């Protein structure tokens, strides 16, 4: 009778069956292990001798491809511990020795300082009010001391809350501050865009606006001078004489809005030149009024104010419309004055030469005159 030998499966075959019968596509299906001849080896083991446990440990290590950084899948780390002399398996037992928990809380002094600051801010208005009324711990009755006790209890509660919930309310304050900063940033950007749009619009109509404002200021000054003339408005001489300066400042403000920043320096230089011309015109008007003051129906400061106002604003508008007019006018005036002074100097020099020549003729000796007559 033939002996029937049933194929036996190794523990590795049973383990593979547990793992959903995974088949390696490179090595094919799992072969059966024949315990009689030992020719068929356990699955996926190369040169495995079951009699040598050392070689079996090496083969198992190769089977799972262990290295020092990985652990075998589907195994508990604490259940499978295989050691080998030549091939070091991974250390599956890991011990976490914590040196100590890190304390994220704020330092004691900072926590105390910030918590105490809230009490100061809470009590400062009341203390300032009592000091202002001069009633700080003076003539206190039962009601006043009751209020003081309630106030102290409230301060103690606030301090305790600030101390115990320090991390919470400081985080809330930080979030609130960041939110407010973002709101301010967005608002500032929106306002900047609005101002830019308005500035571009004003710059496009700057000439019309300058003329309109100049006409309105002219009407206001005429009404002002009319009221002063009729006696219904009593203004001193300094205010009337500074009308041109007020108008120049008004135009400077308007020009700083209507004119871009890169042309503001030109506006400032033009205004300074206008004010210089104001001074010259004021001197001329005062000189004329001192000579012919009796022939003017208006008082002198009214005439001076009108002249300065019209000339100043006319020159300022002209400078805004045609840059460099005042500079050319200054150069022209300087050339004219130089020409006049040069002519006067030449005339004076000619007169001096004529007088000097006459004196030289008078100094000629009589002997020379006789020689000249004989010749």
Swiss-Prot record:
Role of this protein: Promotes unequal transmission of alleles from the parental zygote to progeny spores by acting as poison/antidote system where the poison and antidote proteins are produced from the same locus; the poison component is trans-acting and targets all spores within an ascus whereas the antidote component is spore-specific, leading to poisoning of all progeny that do not inherit the allele.
Native source species: Schizosaccharomyces pombe (Fission yeast)
Stretches with biased composition (Basic and acidic residues): 11-29
Family according to the record: Belongs to the WTF family.
GO CC annotations, alphabetized: ascus epiplasm; endoplasmic reticulum; membrane; vacuole
Effect of a null allele: Abnormal spore maturation in presence of cw27-encoded poison. Sensitises cells to cw27-encoded poison; simultaneous disruption of cw9 enhances sensitivity.
A biological process from GO: meiotic drive
Subunit and interaction comment: Homomer. Forms protein aggregates. The two isoforms can interact with each other and with themselves. High sequence similarity is required for their interaction.
Protein name: Meiotic driver cw27
Transmembrane segments: 108-128, 145-165, 172-192, 208-228, 245-265, 272-292, 336-356
Chain residue ranges for the region called Disordered: 1-42, 74-103
Alphabetic keyword roster: Cytoplasm, Endoplasmic reticulum, Membrane, Toxin, Transmembrane, Transmembrane helix, Vacuole
């Amino acid at each position: 009778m033939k002996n029937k030998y049933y194929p036996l499966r190794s523990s590795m075959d049973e383990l593979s069956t547990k793992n959903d019968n995974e088949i390696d596509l490179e090595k094919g299906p799992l072969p059966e292990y024949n315990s009689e001849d030992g020719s068929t080896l356990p699955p996926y083991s190369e040169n495995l001798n079951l009699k040598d446990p050392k070689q079996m440990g090496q083969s198992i290590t190769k089977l799972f491809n262990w290295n020092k950084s990985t652990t075998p899948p589907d195994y508990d780390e604490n259940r499978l511990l295989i050691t080998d002399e030549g091939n070091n398996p991974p250390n599956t037992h890991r011990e976490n020795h914590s040196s100590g928990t890190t304390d994220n809380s704020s330092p004691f002094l900072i926590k105390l300082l910030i918590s105490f600051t809230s009490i100061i801010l809470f009590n400062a208005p009341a203390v300032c009010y009592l000091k202002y009324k001069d009633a700080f711990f003076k003539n206190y009755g039962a009601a006043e001391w009751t209020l003081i006790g309630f106030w102290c209890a409230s301060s103690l509660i606030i301090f305790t809350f600030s101390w115990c919930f320090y991390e919470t309310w400081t985080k809330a304050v930080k979030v609130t501050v960041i939110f407010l900063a973002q709101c301010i940033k967005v608002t500032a950007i929106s306002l900047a865009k609005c101002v830019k749009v308005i500035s571009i619009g004003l710059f496009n109509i700057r000439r019309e606006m300058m003329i309109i404002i100049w006409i309105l200021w002219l009407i206001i000054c005429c009404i002002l001078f009319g009221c002063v003339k009729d006696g219904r408005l009593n203004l001193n001489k300094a205010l009337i004489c500074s009308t041109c300066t007020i108008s120049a400042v008004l135009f400077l403000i308007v020009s700083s809005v209507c004119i871009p920043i890169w042309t503001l320096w030109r506006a400032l230089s033009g205004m300074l030149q206008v004010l210089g011309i104001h001074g010259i015109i004021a001197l001329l008007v005062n000189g004329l009024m001192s000579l012919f003051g009796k022939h003017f129906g208006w008082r002198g400061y009214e005439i001076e104010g009108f002249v300065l106002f019209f000339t100043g604003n006319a020159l300022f508008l002209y400078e805004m419309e045609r840059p460099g007019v005042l500079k050319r006018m200054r150069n022209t005036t300087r050339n004219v004055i130089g020409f006049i002074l040069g002519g006067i100097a030449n005339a004076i020099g000619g007169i001096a030469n004529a007088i000097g020549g006459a004196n030289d003729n008078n100094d000629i000796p009589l002997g020379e005159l006789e020689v000249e007559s004989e010749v």
